Amino acid sequence: FCTVNSLLLVCKHVAQYGILGIGMTYVIITGGIDLSVGSVVGLVGMIAGGLIQEGLTLKFAGVTLYFSVPAITVICIIIGIIIGIVNGALIAKCKLAPFIVTLGTMYIGRGLANIRSGGNTFSSIKGQEALGNVGIMQFDSRVFAVGGFPGIPIAAILFLILAVIAAFVLKKTPFGWHILAIGGNEKAARLSGIKVEKNIILVYAISGACSALIGLVTMAQIAASHPNTGDTWEMNAIAAVVLGGTSMAGGVGTIGGTVIGAFVIGIINDGMTMCGVSEFWQKVIKGLVIILAVLIDQFQRNLQAK
């Protein structure tokens, strides 16, 4: 488990949970939840894979358009943001429960991912130089390769950069202060002049963007996209956030804690796999870890209330 290659594999998975966890942290701080992140990962992977492999066919014009990787990246991130905005608008404007809204979009996203390909997989995704759509594998490239050291996954570097930015935004900007205030006491935040609806929509948009980014990264890592990619990943993201000390009741949380939580979940997942623990028992253990983390959070809040 402590070999260089094993640790780098853990870093890859930590980046997946961590980037999802960054968006999830913002959402949970406001007192919400986003169960749709895993489905967005799968949907974006299928859209990007289809655009690279098949392009976009305009039947009325009899032509097929192929997009560059930067264009595909932008398109997919925008799709993730739109899904997040829809979630946020239904929650903030229509006053629907976050659990119900994101549960619904979770099923919609997964269904659309399967409809996109008829349940099939896009495999050996690389693009073609002649079509100008190569380069998707750069999401799975490595940096700082020296001698026998294979290099650090670019996804891990991306995770750390996003974590630093997200931590700064949360602690040093009005937006961060506002979402902490909303999670602490929404009524008081509204009375103080904070635009509650706008900020709630924005945190879900950020969560959608993070999910879309992981959809692209995952597709590059396996050079394929499957409609069920990302299934239950929302649980890993939530576990990382809760283990990092973010309160499910809202108003309390840090990005640094989520980074630590992502490493814990990554080590638990990969450690159990390498030790031969079955997938079924892994789910049981992760579920117990989440419950324990929530119990500790509740215990701490009860102590503070006394």
Where are each of the predicted segments found?
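Transmembrane alpha-helical segments in multi-pass inner-membrane proteins
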Residues: Y204-A205, S211, Q221-G287
